[in-house]
Amino acid sequence: KSAYNCCASGKFKNDWVNLCALSNCIKQGARFLDFEIYSYGGQAVVGASPSSSYDFKGTYNCLPVGQVFSTVKAYAFSGQTPNPNDPLFIHLRVKSNNLDVYKQLAKSLGSTFSNLLAQGNSEYANESNGENLTAKPLIDFIGKTIIICDNRCS
């Protein structure tokens, strides 16, 4: 299962993002979690928008990425989900050109998921060193987190 804009509790404009929506997605077995990342006050935050533009966040509020990632870790690998050992895919759609946002994301992901990232073998890091990850057996990623980062604005 996947969850698009998984912190959105309703619409992507004139509505809210919250951790309850995220935990509900995980409790229902979603293992591909999609997030829109923005720069708000120089901080990396999760929001949602109906637009692909970098300069438009449609939700009334936003959530610090640290809180979001901590919530993911607390639920995704616990007995509160039907599939805690399945690989977890975190898809980050970064809607910012602010380099500090990327640094904050890397720091927060590293500190939150340090023992769960699929990095034990360096072939999975840095765009997989040109290796096709889809050719790898899924069992190689049991209990691991795979980060997918997209910063394209269409």
Show which residues each predicted segment covers:
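Catalytic cores of phosphodiester-bond hydrolases, prominently lipid phosphodiesterases
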Residues: 1-154
